[in-house]
Amino acid sequence: MNLNFKLLDGGILPTRAHKADAGFDLYSPEDFMVKNEDSHTIPLKVCVEIPVGYVGFIMGRSSLNRQGLLCLTGVIDSGYTGEIAVILHNTTRKQAGIYDGVHFFKGDRIAQLVICKLADIEDAVAVDKLEDTERGDGGFGSTGA
């Protein structure tokens, strides 16, 4: 199966470094900066056609995490065919005169698009009790550090 992309003026075709990679690298279509303690939305000038029965997730890259940047996860449903965008947040604290933000240039990889097959679920149903499991309702670190 191929994944169809429509490039708007200045958009860069997403790629995978290796055929077995989970995500398609998403590229910045222009230069920009994410200032410390700030968020920046980057329209990618790219549209994607997610096949029916699948969903696309915009995810961060580990190289950005090392710089104090978080990519806010985006969900792309199969019915959406408009321009996709990435939201980056810089967690670095403001320190006068030391470091004002992270600079990106046209063509930099800024996020990745991961495509996942959806489970075949009909509808949401309210019930009085859920099935018992080994884990139960333990969450938020209940299985260890």
Where in the sequence are the language-model features?
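DUTPase catalytic domain/fold
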Residues: 1-145
